[in-house]
Amino acid sequence: MATQGVLAKYRLPPLPTIGEIIKLFNLRAEKQLSQNFLLDLKLTDKIVRKAGNLQNAYVCEVGPGPGGITRSILNAGVEELLVVEKDTRFIPGLKMLNEASSGKVQIVHGDILTYRMDRAFPKHLKKPWDDDPPNVHIIGNLPFSVSTPLIIKWLEQLADRTGPFTYGRTQMTLTFQKEVAERLTASTSSKQRSRLSIMAQNLCNVKNCFTIPGRAFVPKPEVDVGVVHFTPFIQPKIEQPFKVVEKVVRSVFQFRRKYCHHGVSILFPEESRLKCTEQMLRLADVDPTLRPTELTMTHFKKLCNVYREMCDQNPNLFAYNFREELRMRKLQGKTTEEGEEDDLQR
């Protein structure tokens, strides 16, 4: 894992403050885009330090907005900074930073959810997966509305070694709502233990670095924000395809308030549900009366391994979709297990 970064001696020339940039270009945070600006450069410097040593690094910043974190990244002495910004209103301010940094900033007007990061940086930066992480980093103050789908997308690309992970074990330093940050890093039996905990910790060393109070942002969000650092493992804890792990974990946590056998059961069609659920839990040596939050990574590893074997024996099993069965039962006027529907809406 990279050592904690130290901001380099490089400094941008005098520039308008972030607050002045916002006034100069008449920028306002758009509520529908979940935008919140971080103006305190001491905090943006702290975020960048948590990314590790960025001297001569290649960095992709997600959603730079008015450029607070962007300035801190440039001051860390990076070789090149790629910024991906969806909102055209921020482009003029980012161009100003590019000029001030002698062309170190590449500006992409686009959506990070669809941007091809496998083409973002020079090929010579690629490192073998079992080597140290490449000198490539992802940093971003993520809009709340995209943070969860984005990290799930990146985790899948990490598992497949595609997207930003074509360069190797690319590290990420990202902001999330405090609750999401706690879920990503939650340990076994903690209240915040969730699907995100397993999916992230299966593939990465995940560290909740520090919390930024909501009052530090403009406009002030209703929640605090957590800064999370991800360093991909050489080998995942669960050596199964991402889709297999995701399906098992999602199913188990579908009924987080109940015993884990409820979630396991929805992996199987109604006609074989009881038999297959008992078989899977027995072969995985998992107590059916444990709650989902009480299951360790080893429990999930065993569950995924057994489920994969069962899918290999029954090629149609993986395609089974409990939600579709539930929809058909509703159309036919059949009732669901008490509380089942409420849990599925969560």
Swiss-Prot record:
- What protein name is recorded for this chain? Dimethyladenosine transferase 1, mitochondrial
Q: Give, as one word, the top-level EC class.
A: transferase
Q: Name one GO cellular component term.
A: mitochondrion
Q: Which GO terms describe its biological process?
A: rRNA methylation
Q: Which NCBIfam families match?
A: ksgA
What role does it play?
Mitochondrial methyltransferase which uses S-adenosyl methionine to dimethylate two highly conserved adjacent adenosine residues (A1583 and A1584) within the loop of helix 45 at the 3-prime end of 12S rRNA, thereby regulating the assembly or stability of the small subunit of the mitochondrial ribosome. Also required for basal transcription of mitochondrial DNA, probably via its interaction with POLRMT and TFAM. Stimulates transcription independently of the methyltransferase activity.
Q: Which UniProt keywords apply?
A: DNA-binding, Methyltransferase, Mitochondrion, RNA-binding, rRNA processing, S-adenosyl-L-methionine, Transcription, Transcription regulation, Transferase, Transit peptide
Q: What's the source species for this entry?
A: Xenopus tropicalis (Western clawed frog)
